[in-house]
Protein backbone atom coordinates (compact mmCIF):
# COMPACT_ATOMS: atom_id res chain seq x y z
CA UNK A 1 0.00 0.00 0.00
CA UNK A 2 2.78 2.41 0.92
CA UNK A 3 4.55 1.72 -2.40
CA UNK A 4 1.39 2.48 -4.36
CA UNK A 5 0.90 5.77 -2.55
CA UNK A 6 4.57 6.69 -3.02
CA UNK A 7 4.41 5.83 -6.73
CA UNK A 8 1.25 7.93 -7.11
CA UNK A 9 2.87 10.89 -5.33
CA UNK A 10 5.97 10.68 -7.55
CA UNK A 11 3.90 10.43 -10.74
CA UNK A 12 1.70 13.34 -9.70
CA UNK A 13 4.72 15.48 -8.92
CA UNK A 14 6.43 14.68 -12.25
CA UNK A 15 3.32 15.19 -14.39
CA UNK A 16 3.47 19.05 -14.45
CA UNK A 17 7.23 19.10 -15.20
CA UNK A 18 6.95 19.11 -19.03
CA UNK A 19 4.29 21.81 -18.88
CA UNK A 20 6.46 24.05 -16.73
CA UNK A 21 8.92 24.32 -19.62
CA UNK A 22 6.33 25.48 -22.15
CA UNK A 23 5.77 29.09 -20.99
CA UNK A 24 9.41 29.97 -21.73
CA UNK A 25 9.18 28.59 -25.22
CA UNK A 26 8.17 30.72 -28.13
CA UNK A 27 7.98 30.21 -31.84
CA UNK A 28 11.39 30.51 -33.44
CA UNK A 29 9.88 31.26 -36.82
CA UNK A 30 8.69 34.80 -36.02
CA UNK A 31 8.74 36.92 -39.17
CA UNK A 32 11.56 39.50 -38.85
CA UNK A 33 9.97 41.73 -41.51
CA UNK A 34 7.29 43.24 -39.30
CA UNK A 35 5.18 46.36 -39.66
CA UNK A 36 6.56 48.83 -37.15
CA UNK A 37 3.95 50.29 -34.81
CA UNK A 38 4.49 53.78 -33.43
CA UNK A 39 5.62 53.35 -29.82
CA UNK A 40 7.80 55.25 -27.40
CA UNK A 41 9.23 51.86 -26.36
CA UNK A 42 10.94 51.39 -29.74
CA UNK A 43 14.60 52.43 -30.02
CA UNK A 44 17.68 52.02 -32.19
CA UNK A 45 21.26 52.80 -31.16
CA UNK A 46 23.94 52.99 -33.87
CA UNK A 47 27.68 53.35 -33.22
CA UNK A 48 29.95 54.30 -36.12
CA UNK A 49 33.76 54.48 -35.98
CA UNK A 50 36.11 55.65 -38.71
CA UNK A 51 39.32 53.82 -37.83
CA UNK A 52 41.35 55.18 -40.76
CA UNK A 53 42.13 58.31 -38.72
CA UNK A 54 43.95 58.62 -35.44
CA UNK A 55 42.46 59.27 -32.99
CA UNK A 56 39.42 57.23 -33.99
CA UNK A 57 36.44 59.42 -34.87
CA UNK A 58 33.24 58.11 -33.27
CA UNK A 59 29.59 58.93 -33.84
CA UNK A 60 26.71 57.57 -31.79
CA UNK A 61 23.08 58.02 -32.78
CA UNK A 62 20.27 57.02 -30.43
CA UNK A 63 16.76 57.20 -31.85
CA UNK A 64 13.73 56.72 -29.62
CA UNK A 65 10.15 56.04 -30.69
CA UNK A 66 8.89 59.22 -29.04
CA UNK A 67 10.95 61.31 -31.50
CA UNK A 68 14.00 62.01 -29.36
CA UNK A 69 17.30 61.71 -31.25
CA UNK A 70 20.59 61.96 -29.34
CA UNK A 71 23.74 62.43 -31.43
CA UNK A 72 27.18 62.10 -29.84
CA UNK A 73 30.34 62.92 -31.80
CA UNK A 74 34.01 63.02 -30.96
CA UNK A 75 37.07 60.93 -30.23
CA UNK A 76 36.21 60.21 -26.59
CA UNK A 77 35.20 56.71 -25.53
CA UNK A 78 32.16 58.35 -23.93
CA UNK A 79 30.60 58.62 -27.39
CA UNK A 80 29.97 54.89 -27.44
CA UNK A 81 30.32 53.90 -23.79
CA UNK A 82 28.65 55.94 -21.06
CA UNK A 83 30.59 53.92 -18.49
CA UNK A 84 34.07 54.45 -19.96
CA UNK A 85 36.78 54.55 -17.30
CA UNK A 86 39.83 56.12 -18.95
CA UNK A 87 39.28 59.65 -17.67
CA UNK A 88 43.01 60.43 -17.88
CA UNK A 89 42.95 59.87 -21.66
CA UNK A 90 43.72 63.04 -23.63
CA UNK A 91 40.55 62.66 -25.70
CA UNK A 92 38.30 62.13 -22.65
CA UNK A 93 36.50 65.46 -23.06
CA UNK A 94 36.34 65.41 -26.87
CA UNK A 95 32.61 64.79 -27.11
CA UNK A 96 29.73 66.88 -28.40
CA UNK A 97 26.16 65.88 -27.68
CA UNK A 98 23.09 67.24 -29.39
CA UNK A 99 19.45 66.40 -28.86
CA UNK A 100 16.79 66.73 -31.51
CA UNK A 101 13.06 66.23 -31.31
CA UNK A 102 11.45 64.99 -34.51
CA UNK A 103 7.98 63.76 -35.36
CA UNK A 104 7.42 60.21 -34.01
CA UNK A 105 5.86 59.28 -37.37
CA UNK A 106 9.21 60.05 -39.05
CA UNK A 107 10.97 57.85 -36.50
CA UNK A 108 8.57 55.03 -37.29
CA UNK A 109 9.48 55.47 -40.97
CA UNK A 110 13.19 55.22 -40.17
CA UNK A 111 12.59 52.08 -38.10
CA UNK A 112 10.45 50.55 -40.86
CA UNK A 113 13.19 51.19 -43.43
CA UNK A 114 15.75 49.43 -41.22
CA UNK A 115 13.40 46.50 -40.60
CA UNK A 116 12.70 46.23 -44.34
CA UNK A 117 16.46 46.05 -44.95
CA UNK A 118 16.90 43.15 -42.55
CA UNK A 119 17.72 44.68 -39.17
CA UNK A 120 15.82 41.98 -37.26
CA UNK A 121 16.60 39.13 -39.69
CA UNK A 122 19.27 37.13 -37.87
CA UNK A 123 19.48 34.53 -40.62
CA UNK A 124 20.21 37.18 -43.25
CA UNK A 125 22.87 38.81 -41.11
CA UNK A 126 24.98 35.72 -40.78
CA UNK A 127 24.39 34.35 -44.29
CA UNK A 128 25.11 37.55 -46.21
CA UNK A 129 28.16 37.79 -48.41
CA UNK A 130 30.90 38.86 -46.05
CA UNK A 131 33.55 41.42 -46.87
CA UNK A 132 37.11 41.69 -45.69
CA UNK A 133 38.00 43.62 -42.57
CA UNK A 134 37.13 47.28 -42.84
CA UNK A 135 38.62 50.50 -41.57
CA UNK A 136 35.04 51.45 -40.70
CA UNK A 137 32.97 49.89 -37.94
CA UNK A 138 29.23 50.16 -37.46
CA UNK A 139 27.19 48.31 -34.86
CA UNK A 140 23.52 48.49 -34.00
CA UNK A 141 21.27 47.57 -31.10
CA UNK A 142 17.53 47.83 -31.39
CA UNK A 143 14.18 47.08 -29.81
CA UNK A 144 11.32 47.42 -32.27
CA UNK A 145 7.86 46.12 -31.37
CA UNK A 146 9.49 43.92 -28.68
CA UNK A 147 11.83 42.36 -31.26
CA UNK A 148 15.43 42.91 -30.24
CA UNK A 149 18.77 42.88 -32.00
CA UNK A 150 21.94 43.39 -29.99
CA UNK A 151 24.89 41.52 -31.51
CA UNK A 152 28.02 43.66 -31.27
CA UNK A 153 29.47 42.82 -34.69
CA UNK A 154 30.80 45.01 -37.49
CA UNK A 155 27.89 45.20 -39.90
CA UNK A 156 30.26 46.25 -42.71
CA UNK A 157 31.68 42.73 -42.48
CA UNK A 158 28.51 40.79 -41.59
CA UNK A 159 25.88 42.52 -43.74
CA UNK A 160 27.30 45.30 -45.96
CA UNK A 161 23.90 46.25 -47.40
CA UNK A 162 22.37 46.84 -43.98
CA UNK A 163 25.56 48.66 -42.90
CA UNK A 164 25.09 51.19 -45.70
CA UNK A 165 21.50 51.83 -44.59
CA UNK A 166 22.69 52.30 -41.01
CA UNK A 167 25.38 54.70 -42.22
CA UNK A 168 22.71 56.67 -44.09
CA UNK A 169 20.81 57.10 -40.81
CA UNK A 170 24.00 58.26 -39.06
CA UNK A 171 24.69 60.78 -41.84
CA UNK A 172 21.11 62.02 -41.68
CA UNK A 173 21.59 63.12 -38.07
CA UNK A 174 25.35 63.79 -38.00
CA UNK A 175 24.99 67.33 -39.38
CA UNK A 176 21.34 68.19 -38.78
CA UNK A 177 20.04 71.37 -40.34
CA UNK A 178 17.79 73.39 -38.09
How would you label these PLM feature ranges?
Residues 57-79:
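Short, flexible N-terminal segments of the mature chain
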Residues 72-122:
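A short-motif feature that recognizes glycine-rich, charge-decorated loops
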Residues 60, 97-99, 150-152:
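Well-ordered beta-strand positions in beta-sheet-rich domains
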Residues 27-53, 120-178:
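Short, well-ordered, aromatic-rich surface patches in folded extracellular/luminal domains
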Residues 1-26:
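Short, C-terminally biased terminal segments at protein or domain edges
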Residues 65-66, 100-107, 142-147:
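A short, structured loop/turn motif at beta-sheet edges
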Residues 65-67, 75, 114, 144, ...:
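A mature extracytoplasmic/lumenal domain signature
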Residues 63, 110, 138-140:
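Residue-level detector of buried hydrophobic side-chain packing
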Amino acid sequence: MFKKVLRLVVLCSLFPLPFSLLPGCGPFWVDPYITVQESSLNWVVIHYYNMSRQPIRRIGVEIYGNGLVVVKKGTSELVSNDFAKRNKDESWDNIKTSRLQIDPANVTGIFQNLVNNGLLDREKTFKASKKESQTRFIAVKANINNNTYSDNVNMFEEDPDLAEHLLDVVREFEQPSR
